[in-house]
Amino acid sequence: MTKISKRMASLSSKIEDRAYPPLEAINLVKESSTAKFDETIEAHVRLGIDPKYTDQQIRTTVTLPNGTGQTIRIAVIARGEKVAEAKSAGADLAGEEELVDSISKGEMGFDLLIATPDMMPKVAKLGRVLGPRGLMPNPKTGTVTADLVGAIKEFKAGKLEFRADKAGIIHVRFGKASFNADALLENLKTLQETIDRNKPSGAKGRFWKTLYITSTMGPSIEVDIAALQDISQE
């Protein structure tokens, strides 16, 4: 049986078992972020889909207007001049076959992998290593591209790739506890709109099941989905 710390029990006691208006939920998450570091704020979205069917899968990207507050490590697999181009653009790792070899051995010192189209036959062989970690480059998410400078710039600025897991749940970080509430709300709203725009064609019945937000060390707080969808952004 999992033992709940006094700190978590105290924080959880302040959370009611109901869906909160978006801004109120965000303020509660910020108030619950009492760790001695800048906690990450995450959204956990349960959707009415069954990802084992190809027409009920969702994998896309979102560019958060206020970023995530995190620095991501980007690796690039390319050839020749493109390797130097990637490094100049800010890639943390860049290489050809030698990088493919190191990844095949389990060396995963990065959060995102970008590849040029001509290198995909070699990258495809890494599927067993990259696939389970959600790191396989994909044209749909902009991680298979010849425009390395543009892709690196976008992902470093806060563009995120996300997908629904086997249970139909999306997990996305959308800021830090140090962000002001309005910035977090704007990011969360952008995420909601992105998910709605990418609703799978095979989704049936109620699409949004639940939405919870939480900080790294804090309790989960349910958000009123309809209220979030009703917010208009200019």
Curated annotation (Swiss-Prot):
UniProt entry keywords in alphabetical sequence: Repressor, Ribonucleoprotein, Ribosomal protein, RNA-binding, rRNA-binding, Translation regulation, tRNA-binding
Pfam families linked: Ribosomal_L1 (PF00687)
Gene Ontology cellular-component terms listed: large ribosomal subunit
Source taxon at top rank: Bacteria
GO biological process, one term: translation
Function: Binds directly to 23S rRNA. The L1 stalk is quite mobile in the ribosome, and is involved in E site tRNA release.
Assembly mode: Part of the 50S ribosomal subunit.
Family: Belongs to the universal ribosomal protein uL1 family.
Protein name as it appears in the record: Large ribosomal subunit protein uL1
Biological source species: Prochlorococcus marinus (strain MIT 9211)
